[in-house]
Amino acid sequence: MKKAASFLPVVLLLMIPVLSAETPASNPELKLIPEPKEVQVHSGSFRVRGTTRILVEFGHQSEDRIAAETLAEEIHDQSGLKLSITGEKAQAKQERSTITLARLEDSRVKEFLESKGLRADSIGDQGYLLFSDNTHLIVAANTGQGLFYGVQTLRQLLREDGGNLVCPAVSIRDWPSMEWRGVQDDVSRGPIPTEDYMKRQIRILAEYKVNLFGLYMEHVFDFASQPLVAPKEAALTPQEINALVDYAKKLYVTILPEQQTFGHLHHMLKYEIYSEVAERPHGHVLTPTKERSYDIIKAMYADLVPLFPGPFLHVGGDETFELGHGQTAARAADVGLGRVYLEHMQKVNATLQPYHKQLMFWGDIALKYPQLLGILPKDMIAVPWDYDAKPSFESIIKPYRDAGLLVIVAPGAQTWNQLWPNLDTGYVNIRNFVRDGQKLGAIGVLNTTWNDDGEAIYGMAWPTLIFGAAAGWQAGESNIDQFKDAYDWAFYRNGDATFRDALENLDRGHQALAKINVHTETDDLFWIDPFTPEGANMMQKLAAAAPEMRLGAEHALESLYRNAAKAHAHQDTLTDMTLGAWRWDALGMKAEFTQEINKFYWDAFQNQTDADRVGNDLEEITAINARLEDLRDVTTRLSQMYREAWLREYNPFWLDNVLVRYDDLAREFQKKIVAARQARRQYSATKTLTPPQELGFYLQP
């Protein structure tokens, strides 16, 4: 018997009551994310006092202290109380209220919880038991990981009630439905997060029981073997990776290296020294025809693998569009493109076999050749991906399961190429994909964020990322409305629906665009010059959606400015919501103002003999504080807001490639201001106006 177990009779039997039996039950709506598997709410509550302490078993004090610290921080943030964290030796029969964090290896903990109806069977290494009443508050698990997850649930249970911080009386038995619940961050196409921000990502995700964090890398790791590839001013260094892995380990998060080994390698292959191994000159695909390709893969992973102690390596392999159109053309014509692809993946697996890791690969290309999937080693893990709001995803999971391969499903957080994430699409995509993955035996979920156009601000992704975490933990089809109902409390520690309402207002832009059948990515819409024929036509179409888009954005902004203080956790993410709202408003403004500018100028042009009318029309277009100035001003303002958002998360590297887009758009508006003022001066001198089309005013009312 371990010595640490000796304190348990004190904890479980001698603890003094902290509330009288007459105390009315709090019985709040729990609003927990993820939702536990089994929950019973009882009468009463455990009150946290200034004298309450957090007790961890002495034998596990080192490992379990991180869980205790997250709980102590939560209690301090909610109540101002600073609780001590102690082990068995500090217990010493002191009659004070105690929050006990225990391991189920102690038979007395197990027996006590069983006496309260909480069985320890079937919860595994990641599950936990949680019990509270007027006199007890206990979290117990088989492992430190399970205990950590139980504490994260406890943090959400704590509420203010009548000036006191309490935990409602509950019995909870909980465990994950999927072993691996992951999030991937694309750190290769533009923004590269700072080490501090990556730690923050991991810390927040761990609160919601995420245990896998993928770094999607194409060319951004500082490879000793390939010194030309990574941008030295921002490359991920071995020192940063070591720090990240060590930090994540304490939070039970495994860092997953995702280093491409086939496609998406343009930033390597654009250099002349790699021309021999490019499928097509300076292209994207590493050719399988050259042995040097495998030497490069071997060398890259020799640099990477020692830094990542987890069980997986993700070798990519998606979107190999050039394959068969360059050096592999003859081979593909001979044996078929599918065999060329799958033989390469097989050889990559063999090349990396000495590391004794399980290899993941993206499932889009191999899926085209289900009859050939037997070529792949059975220890590889397929990662099928799809980001649409489809009713079913079984068709892209089942072929891999039928071939005897393990599967991790990859939905998307809908952050890329968008002014603000399409939350409605993201929720449905994640819900259905994870549901079908569980049905077909997938071992996990890897919820993806991407940076296709290099603009995505990660802080906008939290709603869909947290929903993905919940869906992976919960069983079957997760309820979107229940998630929305819980999100204010579980993420912001806000007791009403303020931020749910703001998020739904932000999604009105996507809904308005869908109603007019515009499915162009909203970043592209934002950058369109409205004074070109193409841009004018698009603005004319968008004008029907603009009022709804702007009303949603402006209602969200009013609420965020008024109610920011309601966010008692993660308040800084409201700034990212604010940026998203202003970008929506600017897009709607551009659509509306383009219409109005065209209308006024055409009216002036068609009534050139009426000087007063012409003067009034031109005043609407380009006077001080008129519409063209408004478009320029909102663009330059957004440039500054975007810059600040970027630097909160990312290294300065690549930022200028986004800011130049703001500069170019603002410059176009400034040019139009100058041209319109010149037209006004011309009218004053000659009583004639430049034809509208020459100024870029193509929309004749």
Residue ranges and their predicted role:
Residues 1-9:
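Bacterial N-terminal signal peptides that target proteins for export
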Residues 21-181, 432, 455:
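Contiguous, structured surface segment used for ligand recognition
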Residues 74, 115-353, 360, 409-411, ...:
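Feature activates predominantly on carbohydrate-active enzymes
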Residues 103, 217, 449:
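Short secondary-structure boundary segments
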